Amino acid sequence: MIEYIIGKISYKNNNYLILENNFKGYKLFMSDPNIFEENSSAKIFVYTKIFQNNKNNFLFEYYGFKTLREKIFFENLLTVNGIGPKTSLTILRNDLNLLKELIRNEDIESLSVLEGFTNKTALSIVSALSYKLKNERISEYNNDVNHSSINQQSNSYNPVPDLVSALKALGYKKNMIEKAINLLIPQLSNVSEDQISDLISQAIKIISDEAVTNKTTVS
């Protein structure tokens, strides 16, 4: 099996990219191909799916990941009943450290508003992976080149549960909360509890701006 490919990115769109290596072009489905630039060189970790078509021919489908940690988490997701490769890629559009922390903490409510999740999906993933991820916390230090950032992330305050609870209490719907949190994810690392009010205000503004935009479009 291919573990990773080093090559040149010849094409990309929102769903996949084509990586050239040794005069071959590999179509790699990814959660976010746009993190790479066309015509640049890259090392991409690969998961290979092998299946048969209706003519009993064996076909190969490739999924790409920027880091080994992403690939390992993707493979963990595939062990969950009802979770396939496409759903797993959608889930990986969320911050990986945040996902792992919420799963370890069995925080169904916070997971269910993230991209790729429903309440049923969140429950299935937590039931299947929470114990495993708790036991694998130490091994992550061997799979990531930036040990200090993981340590800092795991010890920091996680504002997502408080943010979700506050927005739900204010009457906002799941899809609104999901969009706001996904837009705020870059700001959610290394925040303190006294900043939660500011985050709630920012989330409300995002939701309000979205509502105005949709109303203008309809008009």
Curated annotation (Swiss-Prot):
UniProt GO BP: DNA recombination; DNA repair
Keywords: Cytoplasm, DNA damage, DNA recombination, DNA repair, DNA-binding
Protein task: The RuvA-RuvB-RuvC complex processes Holliday junction (HJ) DNA during genetic recombination and DNA repair, while the RuvA-RuvB complex plays an important role in the rescue of blocked DNA replication forks via replication fork reversal (RFR). RuvA specifically binds to HJ cruciform DNA, conferring on it an open structure. The RuvB hexamer acts as an ATP-dependent pump, pulling dsDNA into and through the RuvAB complex. HJ branch migration allows RuvC to scan DNA until it finds its consensus sequence, where it cleaves and resolves the cruciform DNA.
NCBIfam families attached to this UniProt entry: ruvA (TIGR00084)
Xref: CDD domains: UBA_RuvA_C
Pfam family, one: RuvA_N
Record text on subunit structure and interactions: Homotetramer. Forms an RuvA(8)-RuvB(12)-Holliday junction (HJ) complex. HJ DNA is sandwiched between 2 RuvA tetramers; dsDNA enters through RuvA and exits via RuvB. An RuvB hexamer assembles on each DNA strand where it exits the tetramer. Each RuvB hexamer is contacted by two RuvA subunits (via domain III) on 2 adjacent RuvB subunits; this complex drives branch migration. In the full resolvosome a probable DNA-RuvA(4)-RuvB(12)-RuvC(2) complex forms which resolves the HJ.
SUPFAM superfamilies per UniProt: RuvA domain 2-like
Region: Domain III, residue numbers: 155-219
InterPro entries: DNA_helicase_Holl-junc_RuvA_I, NA-bd_OB-fold, RuvA, RuvA_2-like, RuvA_C
Span list, region Flexible linker: 149-154
Region (Domain II): 67-148
Recorded family membership: Belongs to the RuvA family.
Designated name of the protein: Holliday junction branch migration complex subunit RuvA
GN (gene name): ruvA
Chain positions covered by the region annotation Domain I: 1-66
Domain statement: Has three domains with a flexible linker between the domains II and III and assumes an 'L' shape. Domain III is highly mobile and contacts RuvB.
Subcellular location: Cytoplasm
GO molecular function: ATP binding; four-way junction DNA binding; four-way junction helicase activity
Main location: cytoplasm
GO cellular component: cytoplasm; Holliday junction helicase complex; Holliday junction resolvase complex
